[in-house]
């Protein structure tokens, strides 16, 4: 993943944590600018669980509106279908959030950050 993004050299894991979302729990928009690569591993989730959303790094521009909201090249934000056992890797400076968890079942993820070594 790091090679595809053009990051030379090695990376090392330097922090991780467990997220447990009960009904109505959420995580506001944020990023991990201090890291290079972040990861989310879905331990317990289902189709009705809260989604993780990612915001485009391209600044909004009124001169270039979204012509088709179903076009993945112009989305302002995007969520990936999540299943138990899914691992998502992304640039740490990408803004992301978790919407309010709508169900009584618990949603559990592991999150990781990696830096250059």
Q: Where are the regions that the model predicts?
A:
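A short hydrophobic beta-strand segment most commonly corresponding to one strand
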Residues: 38-40, 104-117
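Catalytic core of non-heme Fe(II) oxygenases with the double-stranded beta-helix
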Residues: 18-89, 106
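A short coil-to-beta-strand element that immediately follows conserved catalytic motifs
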Residues: 6-16
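Short, loop-centered acidic/histidine patches that primarily coordinate divalent metals
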Residues: 57, 91-93, 113-115
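Short coil/turn motifs at secondary-structure junctions
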Residues: 44-46, 97, 115-117
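Histidine-centered metal-chelating micro-motifs
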Residues: 26, 93-97
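Short, well-structured hydrophobic secondary-structure segments
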Residues: 1-4
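Asparagine-centered strand-capping/turn motif at beta-strand->loop junctions
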Residues: 100-101
């Amino acid at each position: 993943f790091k090679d595809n993004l053009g990051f030379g050299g090695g990376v090392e894991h330097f922090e991780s944590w467990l997220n447990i979302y009960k009904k109505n729990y959420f995580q506001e928009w944020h990023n991990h600018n201090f890291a290079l690569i972040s990861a989310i591993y879905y331990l317990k989730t289902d189709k009705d669980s809260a989604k993780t959303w990612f915001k485009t790094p391209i600044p909004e521009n009124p001169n270039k509106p979204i012509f088709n909201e179903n076009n993945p090249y112009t989305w302002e934000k995007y969520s990936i279908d999540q299943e138990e056992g899914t691992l998502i890797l992304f640039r740490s400076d990408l803004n992301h959030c978790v919407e309010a968890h709508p169900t009584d079942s618990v949603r559990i993820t592991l999150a990781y950050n990696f830096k250059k070594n």
